[in-house]
Amino acid sequence: MIFHANPGVIDLGVNIDHVATLRNARGTVYPDPIQAALQAEEAGADLITLHLREDRRHIRDADVRALRPKLATRMNLECAITSEMLDIACEIKPQDVCLVPEKREEVTTEGGLDVAGHFEQVSAACRQLADAGIRVSLFIDADPDQIAAAAACKAPVIEIHTGRYADAHTAEEQAAEFRRVAAGVEAGQKHGLIVNAGHGLHYTNVQPIAALPGIKELNIGHAIVAHAVFAGWQNAVREMKAIMVAARLGTRYPVPGQPA
């Protein structure tokens, strides 16, 4: 049975990358990211997100191929704009592909895609994926120029990078980054885009972001994997989904930069 708490209020995409990281750390076949994905669906995940990196540091090609036909919800495949990755995506045909920047030396994705600076390349990738029947999302910073460029690329979806909000060291810095994200959501909607968000969100900073009414979906992975060490995998997924839904439905949480 798949559990859904208030379906349609706000979607949770559970990223399974770091289940694969744990598997690969010892070169074993466990923990199985496929099993993690299916159990996440049962616990209320609205989609499964996974990033096939060029160096295959966590998710592998076989994981993507094995998972695609087993999902009851939908697959959101993150990948870089390379001919290899685009060809793999067009072969496997996930429901969604989120195009992300990628550097081999980074620990995790460090910022948004520079759509404005690589407009022709991004546009071509969007066309290739759309022609294959795949919905395209662009992972970008909450920057007006990048949002406008994403709309011009004919990408129907953007995912706003929340890393700077999540990594803020002071209350003032976090409040400023929250305002940037909120403004980015509003700008995306004005361009007619579906607006998602993610990166660095966890159990004590997700509430203000989840409360923003213009956000359709949040993609969260590392925090859920980490919390599962103590709470159990399905409990961790259920708890995150419940927090997000409560925030969207009006439960009062502190908003960065506003009085409690």
UniProtKB/Swiss-Prot annotation:
GO terms for molecular function: pyridoxine 5'-phosphate synthase activity. This is Pyridoxine 5'-phosphate synthase. Homooctamer; tetramer of dimers. The active site is at H51 (proton acceptor), E78 (proton acceptor), H199 (proton donor). It comes from the Bacteria. Its EC number is 2.6.99.2. It is found in: Cytoplasm. Keywords: Cytoplasm, Pyridoxine biosynthesis, Transferase. The keyword rRNA-binding does not apply. 3-amino-2-oxopropyl phosphate binds at N15, R26, G200, G221, H222. Pathway: Cofactor biosynthesis; pyridoxine 5'-phosphate biosynthesis; pyridoxine 5'-phosphate from D-erythrose 4-phosphate: step 5/5. Transmembrane segments: none annotated. Catalyzes the complicated ring closure reaction between the two acyclic compounds 1-deoxy-D-xylulose-5-phosphate (DXP) and 3-amino-2-oxopropyl phosphate (1-amino-acetone-3-phosphate or AAP) to form pyridoxine 5'-phosphate (PNP) and inorganic phosphate. It is an enzyme of class 2 (transferase). It holds the Pfam family PdxJ. Its main location: cytoplasm. Belongs to the PNP synthase family.
